Amino acid sequence: MSNFKSKYHDELIANAAYIGTPGKGILAADESTGTIGKRLASINVENVETNRRALRELLFTAPNVLQYLSGVILFEETLYQSTAAGKPFVDVLNEAGVLPGIKVDKGTVELAGTDGETTTQGLDGLGARCAKYYEAGARFAKWRAVLKIGPNEPSLSILSIENAYGLARYAVICQENGLVPIVELEILVDGSHDIHKCAAITERVLAATYKALSDHHVLLEGTLLKPNMVTPGSDSPKVAPEVVAEHTVRALQRTVPAAVPAVVFLSGGQSEEEATVNLNAINQVKGKKPWTLSFSFGRALQQSTLKAWSGKEENVKNAQDALLTRAKANSEATLGTYKGNSQLGEGASESLHVKDYKY
């Protein structure tokens, strides 16, 4: 039982439930300056503040798109940016009924004495940052822990002490300052493991994480989970969406408490269409699913939009149309009603996998 007490108790529960509204999901637009630079470089656009702001404005002002979103995760720079006309992005989102969120971790660092295993940085000063972000309009936060599957990893000590407990400390600090914490656990798709290995590791990781959250008295009703879907490794043959769905839902059923209002999947390098089709299959699985099963996609919502835009003002409408197509498709997938799209935008079927992905 959580002993969490805070003036934000009811607000946290309400905001977490709102983000988990069926038919809606999260746009992850919180790429660091370095990561968004790589995205811009792929379309031959310079990584400067004006271009980063232009891309975010394109995303946040796309006609009819925000109706399919309940939240947008921002990078710190973006939280304080405005449209070209001077309207703060936070106001643009709030007026459309979309909650602004904020990335609060400081990236990963390799742990000495391990075979490339990592822990996430950013706990120092987190409380003060969260208070500042809440004041600026953010209502939820994201912290990404990264694990990989290999012959000997993730090790139990790294899993439970470093990453699970780091996530738990982050979560309770966020809640003390009014932010709903997204607990993000990404098991990288890198490797040749089969889907059964991924399922076993995913279950182990989730079980350790919820043990840590309980130990730290985190209010589960005021949290969200952002896990990977259960898939084979990138060097293994793909399996049908129904197989991904079966293994993913079973892993959640075995480990995620019903008190959690929503599970918002990361795309993990899947193509836009693959991520949507798999999400749709997950929502078509019969059986006990006490949480909303939705999306928190970055690359898998933006790839065809980036390709269509290419940094040119005259392409903004086409780029926003591409974003609308993907947002609507993923909204349908959260309801299990997506029928597929015969007219995919450029890049929608392109694998977005990057080995040892840094966000």
From Swiss-Prot:
Site description Necessary for preference for fructose 1,6-bisphosphate over fructose 1-phosphate, residues in chain: 359
GO cellular component: cytoplasm
Active site: 184 (proton acceptor), 226 (schiff-base intermediate with dihydroxyacetone-p)
Molecular-function GO terms, alphabetical: fructose-bisphosphate aldolase activity
Pathway(s) of this molecule: Carbohydrate degradation; glycolysis; D-glyceraldehyde 3-phosphate and glycerone phosphate from D-glucose: step 4/4
Residues that hold substrate according to the record: 52, 142
EC number: 4.1.2.13
Origin superkingdom: Eukaryota
Catalytic activity: beta-D-fructose 1,6-bisphosphate = D-glyceraldehyde 3-phosphate + dihydroxyacetone phosphate
Family annotation (CDD domains): FBP_aldolase_I_a
Entry's Gene Ontology BP terms: glycolytic process
Gene3D superfamilies: Aldolase class I
First-listed, main subcellular location of the protein, grouped into a coarse class: cytoplasm
Keywords: Cytoplasm, Glycolysis, Lyase, Schiff base
Localization in the cell: Cytoplasm
Family per record: Belongs to the class I fructose-bisphosphate aldolase family.
UniProt-recorded name of the protein: Fructose-bisphosphate aldolase, cytoplasmic isozyme
Organism taxonomic ancestry: Eukaryota, Viridiplantae, Streptophyta, Embryophyta, Tracheophyta
Designated gene of the protein: ALDC
